[in-house]
Regions:
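N-terminal interaction/assembly modules
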Residues: 1-62, 110-113
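A short pre-motif secondary-structure segment
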Residues: 70-71
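Helix-turn-helix DNA-binding module
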Residues: 77-94
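DNA-recognition helix of helix-turn-helix
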Residues: 89-112
Length: 113
């Protein structure tokens, strides 16, 4: 059975970028939390990043083990499809199915759909 994870292109690109930036944003938030008194930036921007991280973490926590591992390979380790196939043994079908599923679920969690 084919899963239907179709979403508008612009939403897909936005969510995919957020997922690709997840690791860097997580490090940034940890840096700010460790030295919150010295933070002199835009607190609204920090709150928005925290909200986006929460949406992504909620979706990642809801995934089964196989999809979670695939999502980490794709979005956190940032392997290409061929790189994931060679290094991690992730098939092309599993790669794209996991990527589309995670993007769709994060978009729904962010109320973009």
């Amino acid at each position: 059975m084919k899963n239907n994870y179709k979403i508008p292109w612009h939403i897909r690109q936005y969510v995919k970028r957020e997922l690709m930036d997840y690791k860097d944003n997580k490090k940034l938030v940890e840096k700010y939390k460790s030295n919150i008194a010295a933070y002199k930036g835009d607190t609204r921007a920090l709150l928005l990043v925290l909200a986006r991280l929460k949406y992504i973490e909620t979706v990642l926590d809801s995934l089964n083990k196989e999809d979670r591992e695939a999502a980490e390979i794709i979005f956190i380790d940032q392997y290409t499809q061929s790189g994931a196939e060679i290094a991690k043994g992730l098939s092309k079908k599993a790669f794209y199915n996991a990527m589309n599923k995670v993007i769709y679920l994060v978009a729904r969690e962010m109320d973009l759909l």
